Every structure is written in structure tokens, then in C-alpha cells.
């Protein structure tokens, strides 16, 4: 029984949201039931909520389809956001100068696991 897979992962790479903002949302769902986590994400008014909700649904689908795990028995075991590449842009300013603008991206990873019996 030790060789049976009990977790599934989903990752979204180079998502156009700052890692700092996405971490505010990801901290809300870590360690929770998947049903509870989906409810939290649905009613959280932050820009990262729809992105993280999509990744969580993908992780649940991976668990069901790839590993035949029961969705009712899953919880968010790991959830983290890493910084992705930064897109560097410039905004024109007065007297021919320019100010840098950093468009930050993130890599979002969600791991769901089966609860211990």
C-alpha cells in the first residue's frame, strides 16, 4: 500500500499577477478541504482568486483522472507561489525621460492529497 500515489499536482506558469498578491490568496486555502477551499476562492474579492481557483480545479481533475482518487476525500496539502520572469517596460515621462515599469509574473503550484483514514 506504500507505493500507491495519494497526491496530485497542478501548476500554472508565468501567470500575469505579482507573487506578493497571489500569496495573499494562496495562504487562505493551504491545509483546507478542497470543497471549502473552492468556496473561499469563489467569494474572495482579490485579483488572484480566479487564477488560483482554476489551478485548484485542475489539481482535483488530475487527482480524479490520473490517479483515481476520490474528490470528496481530498485536501490542499501544499500550495505555494514562486516568482516568474518580470516583463520590463517603460512609461514616458516629462522632458524626454522614462520611468521603468515591472510587470511581474508568478508560478502557482497546488498539491492535493487524500486524507489519512
From Swiss-Prot:
Any one GO molecular function term: structural constituent of ribosome
Annotated keywords: Ribonucleoprotein, Ribosomal protein, RNA-binding, rRNA-binding
GO cellular component: cytosolic large ribosomal subunit
One Pfam family in the UniProt entry: Ribosomal_L22
Keyword NADP: no
GO biological process: translation
InterPro entries, sorted: Ribosomal_uL22 (IPR001063), Ribosomal_uL22_bac/chlpt-type (IPR005727), Ribosomal_uL22_bac/org-type (IPR047867), Ribosomal_uL22_CS (IPR018260), Ribosomal_uL22_sf (IPR036394)
Position of the signal peptide: none
Functional description taken from the UniProt entry: This protein binds specifically to 23S rRNA; its binding is stimulated by other ribosomal proteins, e.g. L4, L17, and L20. It is important during the early stages of 50S assembly. It makes multiple contacts with different domains of the 23S rRNA in the assembled 50S subunit and ribosome.
HAMAP family: Ribosomal_uL22_B
Subunit structure, as described in the record: Part of the 50S ribosomal subunit.
Similarity remark: Belongs to the universal ribosomal protein uL22 family.
Alphabetized PANTHER family for the sequence: CHLOROPLAST 50S RIBOSOMAL PROTEIN L22-RELATED, LARGE RIBOSOMAL SUBUNIT PROTEIN UL22M
Protein name in UniProt: Large ribosomal subunit protein uL22
Amino acid at each position: 500500500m506504500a507505493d500507491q500515489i495519494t497526491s496530485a499536482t497542478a501548476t500554472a506558469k508565468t501567470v500575469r499577477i505579482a507573487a506578493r498578491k497571489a500569496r495573499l490568496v494562496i495562504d487562505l486555502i493551504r491545509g483546507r478541504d478542497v470543497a471549502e477551499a473552492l468556496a473561499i476562492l469563489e467569494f474572495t474579492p482579490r485579483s488572484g482568486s480566479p487564477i488560483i481557483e482554476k489551478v485548484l480545479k485542475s489539481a482535483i481533475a488530475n487527482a480524479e483522472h490520473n490517479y483515481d482518487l476520490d474528490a470528496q476525500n481530498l485536501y490542499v496539502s501544499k500550495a505555494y507561489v514562486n516568482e516568474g520572469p518580470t516583463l520590463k517596460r517603460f512609461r514616458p515621462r516629462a522632458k524626454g525621460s522614462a520611468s521603468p515599469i515591472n510587470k511581474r509574473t508568478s508560478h502557482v503550484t497546488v498539491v492535493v492529497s487524500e486524507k489519512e483514514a
